[in-house]
Swiss-Prot record:
Subcellular locations according to the entry: Nucleus
Organism of provenance: Arabidopsis thaliana (Mouse-ear cress)
Keywords, in A-Z order: Ethylene signaling pathway, Nucleus, Ubl conjugation pathway
SMART domains: FBOX, LRR_CC
Entry note about domains: The F-box is necessary for the interaction with ASK proteins.
Quaternary organization: Part of a SCF (SKP1-cullin-F-box) protein ligase complex. Interacts with CUL1, SKP1A/ASK1, SKP1B/ASK2, ASK11, ASK12, ASK13, ASK18, EIN3, and EIL1.
Domain (F-box): residue spans on this chain: 61-109
Entry's Gene Ontology cellular component terms: cytoplasm; nucleus
UniProt protein name: EIN3-binding F-box protein 1
Protein's pathway: Protein modification; protein ubiquitination
Keyword Ribonucleoprotein among record annotations: no
Known tissue expression: Ubiquitous.
GO biological process: ethylene-activated signaling pathway; negative regulation of ethylene-activated signaling pathway; protein ubiquitination; response to ethylene; ubiquitin-dependent protein catabolic process
Amino acid sequence: MSQIFSFAGENDFYRRGAIYPNPKDASLLLSLGSFADVYFPPSKRSRVVAPTIFSAFEKKPVSIDVLPDECLFEIFRRLSGPQERSACAFVSKQWLTLVSSIRQKEIDVPSKITEDGDDCEGCLSRSLDGKKATDVRLAAIAVGTAGRGGLGKLSIRGSNSAKVSDLGLRSIGRSCPSLGSLSLWNVSTITDNGLLEIAEGCAQLEKLELNRCSTITDKGLVAIAKSCPNLTELTLEACSRIGDEGLLAIARSCSKLKSVSIKNCPLVRDQGIASLLSNTTCSLAKLKLQMLNVTDVSLAVVGHYGLSITDLVLAGLSHVSEKGFWVMGNGVGLQKLNSLTITACQGVTDMGLESVGKGCPNMKKAIISKSPLLSDNGLVSFAKASLSLESLQLEECHRVTQFGFFGSLLNCGEKLKAFSLVNCLSIRDLTTGLPASSHCSALRSLSIRNCPGFGDANLAAIGKLCPQLEDIDLCGLKGITESGFLHLIQSSLVKINFSGCSNLTDRVISAITARNGWTLEVLNIDGCSNITDASLVSIAANCQILSDLDISKCAISDSGIQALASSDKLKLQILSVAGCSMVTDKSLPAIVGLGSTLLGLNLQQCRSISNSTVDFLVERLYKCDILS
């Protein structure tokens, strides 16, 4: 054996003979023949040089992988149906890319073979958010939905790290001819080329939404306009490279357009709005113009050509003056207008708003917010002119006082059903009474939210003026006392929201429940710290159909919860006791008793309720959504 290992240098080899003294043991490690050459470097461990031995274990390439992509493409497009193509697509990314790149017109299927799924064409919808939005997923969706009715609705919400590009939209465009709705949010990696693919392959597209798509220009929108004549809804927001040219193409080619919303697109000017309105006079029903660089000209066009508009939203139009609203109202084109929303437009003055009221005789709903130049005179004039008005909401109109509020109530006619005041800081308490014959019998809903000057005298006047109220919302009115609330006790109240009214007492709740026990369905007294268990006892005794009760941050305890559970009449579906520190684990049996009808339970910030109790309720009340 010593001769075997007595090598002088790198060129020494041992030929012929077994490496190990026992060939049977050696065969367990290496199948070396008696003629294998072995080289032993002097300073390294021995290694075997036998390339021909291990070649038998190498993975041989599959024969079909030898084919170039062109040949595979020809094979895939001749498969008999979408299921077969889908099965092939999920073999590898290479095959998926090839299958998803096949246009519908390139599919070569014998005429005797028909594909199923025509009855529910375009019935599927898919949504990709954030990191899930990738080209591979889009390709898989395109191929996978082809054999199951076809993709009808696609929404892509990207992120800064999104890996979706034109390649993904190419897959959709070539494989989903039934696509009817496409929504793209925050996808800066998609360009006009992606929309060109959609335009070429998805001629049935009806709804298009582009939000923060900074790389899409007029070119992409023009392509959509030319190839998708059935487009009915268009939404553009924060698309910095889309302007008048794209809107002009849409107006000329999409005669069925019914809804347009454009927000924060700096290149959209009067010319684009004018072309849009003048070419869709008979079809356009909903129009939203927000934060645009348009002037009085656009509003004049709206007033003249908006013959079919029923819903109009104007927001943040800083370059529109009083003249614009005056001309819009006098254009007599908005005869069908049903709903009007105006927000943060400096041109809303008394004269402008009165003109709009006169020019829209069929308007039923109006929302006016953030209009610092609107005063009592303008509001009352608008109310007189709007003979069909059923709902009026004012928000952050700080020049409107209590005189404008009551004046509009008295002059809105017999159709006004809902009135809302939100954050109007000039509202104060009445110091003079209203005429004895005054009434507003049609009003059913009144909402006064966060108007700190609104007090008891106003509520007393409302109690006399509006005897048929059903829905009362007095959120955040800390200046109202017990006597003020008692003026509003009607016999038909259905929904009550007194959240944040710190002066609300048990006496008021007892009086309300005793008078409205057979009609009250919703009661919200969140944050009314003077409410105790006595109110819950009254609720349990009087309320027959109450379904939603919010007693968060009230001074209630376990006794109050037990009182609710003891009522045979009460069938609560929603109960909130968030922030009630005196409600403890002792209320567990009572809550379980209420749980037979509960669908929602809020136990957040109930520090005296242990986690084990919450876990038990989650397990026991399996039909109820529990927040803790």
